[in-house]
């Protein structure tokens, strides 16, 4: 297995398709997608823009859909849910189709949707993702961070490094310098992941919006909180991996 890390979807090569791609947005889209599916949501359908989301949601029964939206770390006005994983309780989301659009993570998923196998990873479902990759024995895997509006995000690269560390990758399996750096970053911070999230620019951004968002950072920093792997089952639609 050869593994490559790309800090943002904009860095993904325009040519070449790997066997598997892993989308990462620790703060908070891929954490929240895992939380939604673990809580019993029927599926999460992702959109880069709000207009497409609203148009698609109208074809779904009103009693079986929830609109989830975030821009700049804040819930979209008029939507049912934001991007806090703590909102996605079984009482709220069980058997619901979640129509979701976020600032960064949903854009990453749309960039990767042509790849044969697409899953999402976060720190909270690290172990489940690593086991999925081991079972799949994919020849080439891309670990793609979402970043923040096209820029590097510390927490996404740390999560990519966590995947590489847990897989026990040899140096020969690390396909680019970004993968080497991701592994080194995670190994430096592995005993203080909450501290890393608090120090990250997006963590600081969320805390500036509300100190209560520190509870989200704590949620997102906890390894192996969830044992689910969200997998793309059709373009833009994620459900539990079989």
Swiss-Prot record:
Its EC number is 3.1.3.71. InterPro entries: ComB-like, ComB-like_sf. Its cofactor is Mg(2+). It is an enzyme of class 3 (hydrolase). Keywords: Hydrolase, Magnesium. It catalyses: (2R)-O-phospho-3-sulfolactate + H2O = (2R)-3-sulfolactate + phosphate. GO terms for molecular function: 2-phosphosulfolactate phosphatase activity; magnesium ion binding; sulfopyruvate decarboxylase activity. Belongs to the ComB family. This is Probable 2-phosphosulfolactate phosphatase. It comes from Synechococcus sp. (strain JA-3-3Ab) (Cyanobacteria bacterium Yellowstone A-Prime).
């Amino acid at each position: 297995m050869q593994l490559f890390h790309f800090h943002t979807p904009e860095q993904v090569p325009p040519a070449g398709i790997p066997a598997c791609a892993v989308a990462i947005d620790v703060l908070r889209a891929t954490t929240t997608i895992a939380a939604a599916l673990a809580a019993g949501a029927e599926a999460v359908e992702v959109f880069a823009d709000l207009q497409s989301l609203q148009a698609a949601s109208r074809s779904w029964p009103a009693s079986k859909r929830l609109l989830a939206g975030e821009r700049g770390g804040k819930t979209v006005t008029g939507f049912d849910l934001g991007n806090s994983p703590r909102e996605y309780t079984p009482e709220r989301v069980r058997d619901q189709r979640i129509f979701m659009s976020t600032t960064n993570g949903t854009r990453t998923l749309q960039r990767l949707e042509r790849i044969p196998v697409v899953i999402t990873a976060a720190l909270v479902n690290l172990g489940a993702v690593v086991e999925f990759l081991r079972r799949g024995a994919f020849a080439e895997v891309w670990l793609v961070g979402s970043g923040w509006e096209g820029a590097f995000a510390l927490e996404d690269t740390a999560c990519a490094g966590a995947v590489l560390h847990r897989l026990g990758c040899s140096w020969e399996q690390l396909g680019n310098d970004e993968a080497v750096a991701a592994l080194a970053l995670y190994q430096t911070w592995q005993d203080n992941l909450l501290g890393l999230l608090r120090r990250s620019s997006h963590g600081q951004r969320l805390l500036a919006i509300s100190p209560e968002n520190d509870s989200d950072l704590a949620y997102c920093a906890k390894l192996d909180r969830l044992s689910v792997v969200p997998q793309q089952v059709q373009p833009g639609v994620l459900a539990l991996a079989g």
